[in-house]
């Protein structure tokens, strides 16, 4: 599964994959695999991303278009 919102929100904030990888304490390659759906996002990663961007986990997972 590819999470289009994960990439879109990163790009909307003018961030690189390496920027988010540092926040998550993972490699850029690992973050790229999250974004492309190669590696499943853990609950911990989803919570960190949701808190960082101020959006709901459902938004990150493309389950809604509502950011909150």
Model-identified regions with their sequence ranges:
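Alpha-helical residues within the helix-turn-helix
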Residues: 11, 22, 51
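Short alpha-helical DNA-recognition segment
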Residues: 15-33
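DNA major-groove recognition helix of helix-turn-helix/homeodomain DNA-binding modules
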Residues: 25, 44-59
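DNA major-groove recognition helix of helix-turn-helix
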Residues: 35, 53, 61-64
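A short, Lys/Arg-rich alpha-helix, primarily the initiator
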Residues: 1-12
């Amino acid at each position: 599964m590819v999470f289009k919102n994960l990439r879109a929100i990163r790009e909307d904030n003018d961030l690189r994959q390496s920027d988010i990888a540092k926040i998550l304490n993972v490699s850029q390659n690992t973050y790229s695999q999250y974004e492309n759906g190669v590696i499943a996002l853990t609950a911990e990663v989803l919570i960190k991303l949701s808190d960082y961007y101020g959006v709901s986990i459902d938004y990150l997972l493309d389950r809604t278009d509502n950011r909150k």
